[in-house]
């Protein structure tokens, strides 16, 4: 991820970076380019999208969260519950945010993002590593990521995501 030096307003950010790929995120007033996704990243993103739908969430990929004037992230996968509010971007915290690591991602920046999602009130924050075949969830009590061992029980809905299922699907897609 590359950070651009000058601070910008939300309006300036959207005017300059809205159509750029790889995507940019606004982080504390600074445009930060997301890492270029690999094939494995893209496959895992699609699998997580599908699994969230199967678990009863309305899932979306690369959805910009327009909740703050200074921080506008674009998580890899989001999950929502309930009726659509008709807005182009969520303006309130979504129940599920998933980040998929790319080789260039700095883990400290990922932790910072997770901490911000938690401050917003997002109950289910997950991070997946498609290469290391690991996943973490955000733990409010420790204010840190905790490794998912076998499955993750969502807080926003009484369902569970099985980690073996995730990576078995990734293996099947990758073969």
Residue ranges and their predicted role:
Residues 1-175:
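Gly/Pro/Ser/Thr-rich low-complexity, intrinsically disordered segments predominantly at protein N-termini
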């Amino acid at each position: 991820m590359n950070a651009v030096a000058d601070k910008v307003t939300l309006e300036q950010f959207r005017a300059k970076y809205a159509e750029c790929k790889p995507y940019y995120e606004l982080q504390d007033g600074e445009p930060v380019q997301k890492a270029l996704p690999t094939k494995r990243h893209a496959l895992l993103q699609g699998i997580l999208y599908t699994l969230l739908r199967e678990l009863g969430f309305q899932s979306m990929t690369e959805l910009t969260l327009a909740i703050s004037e200074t921080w506008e992230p674009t998580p890899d996968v989001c999950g929502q519950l309930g009726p659509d509010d008709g807005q182009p971007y969520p303006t309130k915290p979504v129940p599920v945010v998933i980040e998929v690591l790319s080789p260039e991602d700095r883990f400290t920046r990922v932790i910072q993002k997770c901490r911000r999602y938690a401050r917003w009130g997002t109950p289910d924050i997950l991070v997946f590593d498609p290469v290391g075949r690991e996943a973490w969830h955000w733990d409010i009590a420790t204010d840190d990521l905790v490794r998912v061992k076998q499955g993750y029980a969502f807080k926003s809905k009484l369902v569970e995501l099985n980690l073996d299922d995730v990576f078995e699907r990734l293996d099947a897609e990758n073969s």
